[in-house]
Every structure is written in C-alpha cells, then in structure tokens.
Amino acid sequence: MPGYKDFLKKNKVNADKIKTWTDFQSVPPVSKQNYLRQYPLGQLCFDGKLDNKALVFTATSGSTGPPFYFPRDEVLDGQYSVYLENFINNISEKKRRKSTLVIDAFGMGVWIGGLITYQAWRMLALRGYPITIITPGINKKEIFDAFNNLAGHFEQVVFCGYPPFVKDIIDEGEEVHGINWKKMNIKFLFAAEAFSETYRNYLIQKTGIKNVYRDMANVYGSADLGAMAIETPISILARRLAVDDDALFKILFNGANKIPTLAQFNPGFINFEASEGSILCTGYNALPLVRYAIGD
C-alpha cells in the first residue's frame, strides 16, 4: 500500500524492525483524519490500484463528516460467513441442518449491513446448508409478506435486522397484522447497535424463543472491516450474569455506564487493542488497516 508506506516513512517507522508485539504497539495508529483522508483512495489499497479488482464499495454514515467509501472483496464476506456458520450450527438441534429462511431486513444501498449479510448467507448456502434468502431490506410490507407467505415452508426463520427496527416489526406484526410469533420457529441476528438484556428478554417473551443463548446473536461490525465479532452462547451468558453481579460487571466492562456488547472474534481475521479508552483494529480488507482507530 503506497499510502501506508508513506505514512510509516513520515512517522519515521522502519517496518523491517517491527518484529515483536511490543514493537508493533509502537507503530502509530491510523484514523480517517490522519491517514484515510490524506491519500488518494487507490494509494490505500494493495499495489496502489482500485481499477483492476472485483470490489464492492460501502459508505460510512457520514455522521462525523463526509462519508468515506471502503472497497471490499470476497474475503470479508467469507469471514462473516464463518461467524454465521457457527451461529447456524448452534441453533441446529442434534446438528441436523434445518431448512432455513433468512429474512435480511438490514438497510440495502451503500450501507454495509444488508449486502454483506446477504453475501455471507449465500456463501453458506453454496457450502451445502439448506438456506433460502429473501432481501426486503427495511420495506415493512415485504417483510410481513415474507413472514406470511414464505415462513411456513421452512423449519426455521432467521430474521436479520437493526435492533430497534426488529422490535418495530415484532410489535407491529402482532398488533396490526395478527402474526402469532410463538407459532414460528424464529431466530434473530442483529447488528449496528448494542441493546440491553431487557430488550432481549422482551423478544423472548414476544416470540417464545426457546434458547436465549443460541437463538439470537448481535454482530459487531463496521463498514471499515466488515463483521468483526459476534455474540456466542458463552458471551451472552457472561453478559446476562453481569447484569445482576456488580463485581463481574466491573471485571468485564471496567465501570462502563451502560452494558456494552460482549462478543467473540476470530484472531485469524482481526486483532483488537485497547488504547487510552478506544479500540484499535488491525484487519484485512481490500483497503487493509493497521492499528486503526475505529472510533469506538
């Protein structure tokens, strides 16, 4: 990456001398301000080029300035599919693969959630899992039509969406459309926002979820690096125990004002560091990032 090579040179870092973890921690962090917006986009990519690769662009929200466009290739989609494979195996009784309808209700368009979720589930289907996908995005009519007309053809439904939007669908489905969620074998995949255990309990009560630890999971992801981590049964258990145990809460969350997401990651995909109260990420993308201050 010519841009990163220049960044290291300007910061007087000799990459050949970075041999140990301690050495690595001396490398200056990068951010949108000091790195991504300082170089032409192509200079941030492998071999300094964008136009000779099969890429998909995703935009940041632009909430803190102009949107930044991250290119990605199929590697990030594949990493996400590994997390989803673990999730689908967790919800499979006796490891038998159930026929599954995936309703992808994340926003489509330039945002990462909808498309990367579709692509990751599609990869799983191509690996032999009996998965069928529909992508209504945030179109409520299409979501309710999918539940009413398609869900009954499958042994289980995985509903994927932004937590507040998922709650809207569950409430409106019951109150306006007369859907009996407890008759559906529904599972949930969330992303884009942390939520409380009260929220999780609410969905359990509304939908009759049988296994709180296996039947729903929140993904920690970003436009920058895709799906970076996911809740697992053990992380959900630890989080729920911490709600009622101040000592455990302090150990896990170091005095946070509200309960954060607790997720697990694959160190073969990404690395996390805690630095002065913020998170630094190192991970692969078509635009690789080393000690990147993601803003969390």
Give, region by region, the residue ranges found by the protein language model:
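Phosphate/oxyanion-binding active-site loops and adjacent basic polyanion-contact surfaces
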Residues: 75-84, 111-114, 136-139, 161-165
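Nucleotide 5′-phosphate-binding alpha/beta core
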Residues: 1-100, 104, 149, 153-154, ...
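Conserved AMP-binding
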Residues: 106-110
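Residues at alpha-helix caps and immediate loop-helix transition turns in enzyme cores, especially N-
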Residues: 113-117, 199-202
